[in-house]
Amino acid sequence: MKKQDISVKTVVAIGIGAAVFVILGRFVVIPTGFPNTNIETSYAFLALISAIFGPFAGLMTGLVGHAIKDFTTYGSAWWSWVICSGIIGCLYGWIGLKLNLSSGLFSRKSMIYFNIGQIIANIICWALIAPTLDILIYNEPANKVYTQGVISAVLNIISVGIIGTILLKAYASSQIKKGSLRKE
């Protein structure tokens, strides 16, 4: 098996991605009225970074970005959700491997594939894993954390489904389409 190094491009993407994740997570959220649960624009951006740079970049951007956001907002990290931000970034990256965005294509079929994948990933992460980790790590009440998890999953599905799809389409549209250049 060939050893695969992490490129400078990926490291830079993780750093910039984490910084933008923090800014969006701190300043571009819409409160829902349910405690510690907001409409987050940062996950739509995480989907973009993950789809472009892959699962590892998504994992690290989610982990680092969410940890820094929590430390700068609350003074400490809520590790169960930080872990899930990394997992969701990794899952978005795996979904993105099949999208072929760099060739300038993001067809209706690709949009459907992306959205089915992100719906499944968000349900797994936010409605199942995050609340379960809250119970195991912090001994939180199950009814509270599963309610938060389901609400977060639904809100992230909507945010990523709308904003994330727009970002992916805009990125793909900015790429040179395969076969569009001809030698004269």
From Swiss-Prot:
Which Pfam family is one of those matched by this entry? ECF-ribofla_trS
Q: Where in the cell is it found?
A: Cell membrane
Gene source species: Staphylococcus aureus (strain JH9)
UniProt KW Cell membrane keyword: yes
The identity of this protein, by name, is UPF0397 protein SaurJH9_2709
Gene Ontology cellular component terms for the protein in this record: plasma membrane
Family classification: Belongs to the UPF0397 family.
Describe its membrane topology. Multi-pass membrane protein
Entry superkingdom: Bacteria
Establish whether keyword GTP-binding is in the entry: no
What UniProt keywords are attached to this protein's entry? Cell membrane, Membrane, Transmembrane, Transmembrane helix
Transmembrane stretches in the record are 11-31, 44-64, 77-97, 111-131, 148-168
InterPro entries tied to this protein? ECF_substrate-spec-like, UPF0397
Task: State the signal peptide span.
Answer: none
